[in-house]
Amino acid sequence: MSDKIGLFTGSFDPMTNGHLDIIERASRLFDKLYVGIFFNPHKQGFLPLENRKRGLEKALGHLENVEVVASHDELVVDVAKRLGATCLVRGLRNASDLQYEASFDYYNHQLSSDIETIYLHSRPEHLYISSSGVRELLKFGRDIACYVPESILEEIRNEKKD
């Protein structure tokens, strides 16, 4: 029997504790879980891709079956096929997230009907945490330590120094 391989994607700009929780839970469902950092042309970048990747790798270092990959100008289903993933993992905080994700699920299924999508609901303590909310707090100089993993906080501090 072949390994169960999943792919969880996002821009992770920055990664939050909500992302971390979904990844930790998803890692228990698969033999191998790829975490794909995707460039989102609809979002203005906050942290450079290299910083995001390094921060994620540190935050996820305790998960032996998880590997961080980065992608530019590729569809998620194409990356999934290339990596051998048969399942996309998505996190949901609310009904708006479900509606947003459902449209992508439709197209992904049209492009590759053998790739399934599973949704993991956010835990109550993470329902209102978002990367955009964290960026907004940072813009006004507020502390974000309770919203992001320590390694991400380090990357943000290092980027601010430069």
From Swiss-Prot:
Cofactor(s) required for function per UniProt: Mg(2+)
Molecular function via GO: ATP binding; pantetheine-phosphate adenylyltransferase activity
Site-annotated residues for Transition state stabilizer: 19
Keyword DNA repair: no
Binding positions for ATP per the UniProt entry: 11-12, 19, 91-93, 101, 126-132
Residues binding substrate, per UniProt: 11, 43, 76, 90
Subcellular location: Cytoplasm
UniProt entry tagged with the keyword Nucleotide-binding: yes
Pathway in which this enzyme or protein is active: Cofactor biosynthesis; coenzyme A biosynthesis; CoA from (R)-pantothenate: step 4/5
Any one Pfam family match given in the protein's UniProt record, by short name: CTP_transf_like
Reactions catalysed, as given in the entry: (R)-4'-phosphopantetheine + ATP + H(+) = 3'-dephospho-CoA + diphosphate
GO BP field: coenzyme A biosynthetic process
Gene Ontology CC terms, in alphabetical order: cytoplasm
Record keywords: ATP-binding, Coenzyme A biosynthesis, Cytoplasm, Magnesium, Nucleotide-binding, Nucleotidyltransferase, Transferase
EC number of the protein: 2.7.7.3
Paired cysteines (S-S): none
Main localization, broad class: cytoplasm
Subunit and partners: Homohexamer.
Function: Reversibly transfers an adenylyl group from ATP to 4'-phosphopantetheine, yielding dephospho-CoA (dPCoA) and pyrophosphate.
Protein family membership: Belongs to the bacterial CoaD family.
Record protein name field: Phosphopantetheine adenylyltransferase
Organism: Streptococcus pneumoniae (strain JJA)
